[in-house]
Design a protein with these regions (language model features):
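Alpha-helical transmembrane segments of integral membrane proteins, especially early/N-terminal helices
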Residues: 1-13, 35-41
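Alpha-helical transmembrane segments
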Residues: 7-19, 80, 113
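Alpha-helical membrane-associated segments of multi-pass integral membrane proteins
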Residues: 14, 93-137
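Juxtamembrane "helix-exit" motif on the non-cytosolic side of transmembrane helices
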Residues: 20-32, 58, 85-96
Length: 139
């Protein structure tokens, strides 16, 4: 049972690539004022992250018997996206239509939901023995 598994690292690496590509595309489309395409790539970006998390998370669930209700994936996404977005602004790669404040507000709200997810994780963890659900052990 590994907290930082190969599947989680694969997800983090793919997420970083997706985020950088998304940021490049977002900046270019915002600069060109192509609002429709901004929405399209945003939805595609979110969908791609969801599918990647679903696939790597399911595979991890089969290989690594840890019951965390997806918290590790949520936390990894929060950290990778936050660092990539902050770095994007610190390096001056953002569009004039992008604001660091939007990143900070997103991280603040997301952090609140992440905290709630952590509480859920702790509650579910009480129902497990060393990360394995009790019903999986005693059936």
């Amino acid at each position: 049972m590994k907290i930082i598994s190969r599947n989680l690292l694969l997800f983090a690496a793919l997420l970083l690539i997706y985020t950088l590509l998304f940021r490049f595309g977002l900046g270019a489309l915002l600069t060109q004022k192509k609002w429709f395409w901004v929405v399209i790539i945003s939805v595609l970006y979110g969908g791609l992250i969801f599918v990647t998390a679903l696939m790597t998370g399911r595979r991890d669930g089969k290989e690594n018997f840890i019951f965390d209700a997806g918290f590790r994936w949520n936390f990894t996404t929060f950290v990778v996206w936050g660092i990539a977005s902050e770095a994007w602004f610190l390096l001056g790669l953002h569009s004039t239509y992008e604001s660091i404040r939007a990143v900070h507000i997103t991280l603040f709200i997301w952090g609140g939901f992440l905290f709630l997810h952590f509480i859920l994780f702790l509650i579910l963890r009480r129902r497990t023995i060393k990360g394995v659900h009790k019903t999986d052990i005693f059936e």
